[in-house]
């Protein structure tokens, strides 16, 4: 597995933070780093496989990667990221207690992926731009200024994420996307889902298409196919059982959609013929 080292990314041996844009981020094999990373998705879509689990990511997704996590990107479509790298929560000169603003593992579950709305994403861009323009000077005021900007970024992400609740349409859509991530296998009536999240059906279609580039049903199908591919790789269940488990009522239809999405059949994935994509 590829290991990325801080010496190749940070401007100096003492710099606590570095900014790495990926515009766009192409498919990238599994790797880990000797530093921590906040991945901010600007726009586009892709699959983020994080510690073996696949997540659909799009504009407004924020992922917190620790120095022992492994991850990869695949099936990317104009996926543009900004990576904010930092050595560790304890490596700052003027900041303490940062763990309280970061996601925390509970009962073995690490909530690595947050979502922020488009208004917050614009504020994030402005903060990141300030961090990029702060320069690499290592005198005390310059270091303090960069650390303050990093703290402001964490506070903004925390306040804007789903964890803090939300009230506007943009935020309701984020809640809906998070709900689909957990309930993708259920039968979905879009009118009922729109009502559940206090959105009009037209607003749901328009905003989801704007944020992901996909219609609601196309997004749901892709989500189901991603989960199915994960099971094909990591379980012994039959193709038919996996199709039903992931919300498809007909295994032949599932196989057709699967090949159309990934250019491989479910049987190819089961036999490991897609190694080039991993």
Swiss-Prot record:
- What is the name of the protein in this document? HTH-type transcriptional activator RhaS
| DNA-binding region (UniProt annotation) | 191-212, 239-262
Which NCBIfam families does the record associate with it?
A: PRK13503.1
Keyword Lipid biosynthesis in the entry? The reply is no
Q: What is its main location?
A: cytoplasm
| Cross-referenced InterPro entries | AraC-bd, AraC_XylS_family_regulators, Homeodomain-like_sf, HTH-like, HTH_AraC, HTH_AraC-typ_CS, RhaR_RhaS-like_N, RmlC-like_jellyroll
Domain HTH araC/xylS-type per the UniProt entry, residue ranges:
174-272
Q: Its function?
A: Activates expression of the rhaBAD and rhaT operons.
The UniProt record lists the keyword Repeat: yes
Recorded GO CC terms: cytoplasm
Source domain of life = Bacteria
